[in-house]
Amino acid sequence: MKIALAQMKMDTDIEKNFQKSLQLICEAAEKKADLICFPEIQLSPFFPQFPDCDVSEYVMTEDSSYVKGIRNACRENHIFASPNFYIEEKGHRYDMSLLIDDQGEIIGRQNEIVNNGWQVFQTV
């Protein structure tokens, strides 16, 4: 299996990040990659480092045009992808990695799991 890792500098503009994602999918497919993996929260700057900022403009659902666009690009380019989006489900927001197959179908989901507040355990 040939895996492409998308190295992106994210902008505050979702559309710019989306277009860059589509471009990277095409490039990975042209180079015969089977799967392309994207960075955390790929359509926005990495905002978790700024806990007080308003990030509502970056929230989406799996039905958003951006997720559908990535799915279409996978189908058109015959490549699997693992994009990462800031998703809202049932009133909760978190980043979620999807696994999209080469037919554009979502075949896997992984929600972010944060272990904040857990005490460090002793290792021997």
Name each model feature, range by range.
Residues 55-68:
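A short acidic, glycine-rich active-site loop
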